[in-house]
Amino acid sequence: MVVIRLARGGAKKRPFFNIVATDSRNRRDGRFIERIGFYNPVASGAEESVRIAQDRLAYWQGVGAQLSPTVARLVAQAGKAAA
């Protein structure tokens, strides 16, 4: 099953997450199919904290990909900020 979830990057004590479409059996930071966006939890000031390619997200959901609970929350947050 394809899932859309966060893959951690960044440095120690400076987390940065890529929002990726991947097979559910792969490791958290392992191989992925496509990078859909990013989430920067330590963004400050004018820095962008969340970016999601809505067209690719809609495509993956259309073919049956499931969102992780955290990604679902970030999608709702990004939608609210865009409106």
Swiss-Prot record:
Family recorded in the similarity comment: Belongs to the bacterial ribosomal protein bS16 family.
GO molecular function, one term: structural constituent of ribosome
GO cellular component assignments: cytoplasm; small ribosomal subunit
PANTHER family reported in the protein's UniProt record: 30S RIBOSOMAL PROTEIN S16, SMALL RIBOSOMAL SUBUNIT PROTEIN BS16M
Name recorded for this polypeptide: Small ribosomal subunit protein bS16
GO biological process, one term: translation
SUPFAM superfamilies assigned: Ribosomal protein S16
Transmembrane segments: none
InterPro entries: Ribosomal_bS16, Ribosomal_bS16_CS, Ribosomal_bS16_dom_sf
Pfam families: Ribosomal_S16
NCBIfam families, per the entry: S16
Gene: rpsP
Keywords: Ribonucleoprotein, Ribosomal protein
